[in-house]
Design a protein with these regions (language model features):
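C-terminal charged capping/lid subdomain of soluble metabolic enzymes
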Residues: 28-30, 369-456
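Conserved beta-strand elements of the Class I
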Residues: 68-69, 124-126, 172
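A glycine/threonine-rich phosphate-anchoring loop and its flanking beta-alpha core
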Residues: 146-260, 364, 371, 375
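A glycine- and small-aliphatic-rich helix-loop capping segment at beta-alpha/alpha-beta transitions
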Residues: 86-90, 114-120, 139-156, 186-196, ...
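An N-terminal, well-structured beta->alpha segment
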Residues: 6, 11, 19, 23-98
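Active-site segments that bind and position negatively charged phosphate/pyrophosphate groups
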Residues: 247-390
Length: 456
């Protein structure tokens, strides 16, 4: 071993500039705590009708012989479930089927999946369903590969936020909703029931090895579910495009400590804007006519595209505020969801906060908010920067009305007296709220939730 001594003579840092042309490349010689790098990570993606039938061949080619299939129970007897199981059998892949998946996963449902995975000693995982199913498979993969106390890997401050020690076993994700983009991200979200809080695990090692995006798998998606999940796509893209720039984030001591959610960067911006444009063009069509194959397929692809963007840049206040909205639900029962308990679907819980948030964050970068509004179809030529928040909020509301979303938090059961509890539930969501371009403490969150009670 050799001892190496190095003296840094001139360490140049990158500073965020409000000028579009110099957003990422204005250089200065101080502010040493800021990062100068970002890292893009993404799952392999395969898109096309009929690609589900290739699953068994993929596992065979990787010489994987014992897999745990995590599947939404509603899909087992539907064509997508049948195609998955037939493909595995045709390629002599030994598998077990786990279907104890919650519509909104909890700490206990994650732990149950992990127990099954540990007992089965699997060499691979397959997830078939929406984001809840894929996230459950991620958790099963993690805890069976690196067993630990459940909260060791859970995001701080609810958990210890320990980094995942190394790569996981191969996970192939087959999404059946056009929403979460979980097939591309290193995030697994769950409800911590005891605290009425939503939190998760975030690390790039959680990303699936492959996402198989097959438009045939959304044929049976109810219109109301397509609307809610589609607005989640909108939120992912919008928040990742309006988050802090990566140069405003503290520099980690080691590269492995660089978070999955790093802030906006020149590459994630491309994915975010394209996803917003696809939502503009295809979401209303996909909801209005479930037989519109082009619109359904393009929304499924948009979910993955947005996932690649926000899976590296991150989301911020609308998602952070959504977690207590979903976790503290009282008696709201949404159309299209076959559940026997109260539920505010994730996409709805996010979009209800979005108009208030974009009005709040627009002063941080009016041009960026106007560009997002333009991608969603707004006319922005000649619009002054001070109107950026209102223009973007109006465009989001346009989609909410078109897709018949509830008119604010009051429409899903919350009142002014609930706001303090919603604020309390948002404050621990540091992983995402710290990416807001304007800091939101208790006072700001109180105003935002109050504004979100009734939207129009």
């Amino acid at each position: 071993k050799h001892a190496v001594t190095c003296r840094i003579i001139d360490w140049r840092r990158v500073e965020h500039s409000s000028e579009a042309a110099g957003r990422y490349f204005t250089v200065r010689h101080n502010d040493m705590e800021k990062d100068t790098a970002f890292q893009m990570s993404a799952s392999n993606i395969r898109y096309g009708q009929g690609t589900t039938s290739e699953l068994g061949m993929d596992l065979d080619d990787m010489q994987l012989r014992r897999t745990l299939v995590v599947m939404d129970p509603a899909l087992i007897s539907l064509p997508v479930g049948e195609r998955v199981l037939e493909s595995l059998k045709a390629n002599a892949v030994d598998f077990d089927l786990f279907s104890e998946v919650s519509v909104e996963p909890t700490d206990s449902s994650f732990q149950r999946a992990a127990e099954v995975a540990i007992e089965g000693d699997y060499d691979s995982f397959v997830a078939v369903g929406g984001g809840s199913t894929i996230d459950t498979a991620k958790a099963a993969n993690l805890y069976s590969t690196y067993p630990a106390d459940f909260f060791d890997y859970v995001n701080a401050p609810i958990g210890k936020g320990k980094p995942i020690p190394g790569p996981l076993k191969p996970l192939i994700a087959i999404p059946t909703t056009a929403g979460t983009g979980s097939e591309t991200t290193g995030v697994a979200i769950f409800d911590y029931v005891e605290k009425h809080a939503k939190t998760g695990i975030a690390h790039r090692y959680l990303k699936p090895l492959l996402g198989i995006i097959d438009p045939d798998n959304t044929l049976t998606l109810p219109p109301a579910v397509a609307a809610a999940t589609g607005l989640d796509v909108l939120s992912h893209a919008l928040e990742s495009y309006t988050a802090i720039p990566f140069t405003d984030r503290p520099r980690p001591d080691r590269p492995i400590e660089r978070p999955a959610y790093q802030g906006t960067n020149p590459i994630s911006d491309i994915w975010a804007i394209r996803a917003l444009e696809m939502v503009r063009d295809y979401l209303p069509r996909a909801v209005a006519d479930t037989s519109d194959d082009e619109a359904r397929g393009q929304m499924l692809l948009a979910a993955a595209i947005a996932g690649i963007g926000f899976g590296n840049a991150g989301v911020h206040l609308p998602h952070g505020m959504s977690y207590p909205v979903a976790g503290r639900v009282k008696d709201f029962h949404p159309a299209g969801y076959d559940v026997d308990h109260a539920l505010v679907p994730h996409g709805i819980s996010v979009i209800l906060n979005t108009p208030a948030v974009v009005r709040f964050t627009a002063p941080a970068d009016p041009g960026r908010h106007l560009r997002a509004a333009q991608a969603l179809g707004a006319e922005t030529e000649g619009v002054p920067g001070e109107d950026a928040g209102e223009i973007l909020a109006d465009q989001v509301i346009h989609f909410m009305k078109t897709l018949e979303m509830p008119n604010g938090l009051a429409a899903v059961g919350y009142q002014q007296e609930d706001v303090p509890a919603l604020v309390e539930g948002t404050l621990p969501q540091h992983r995402v709220t710290k990416l807001s371009p304007i800091e939101a403490g208790p006072e700001e969150l109180t105003r935002l939730f109050t504004d979100a009670l009734t939207i129009w």
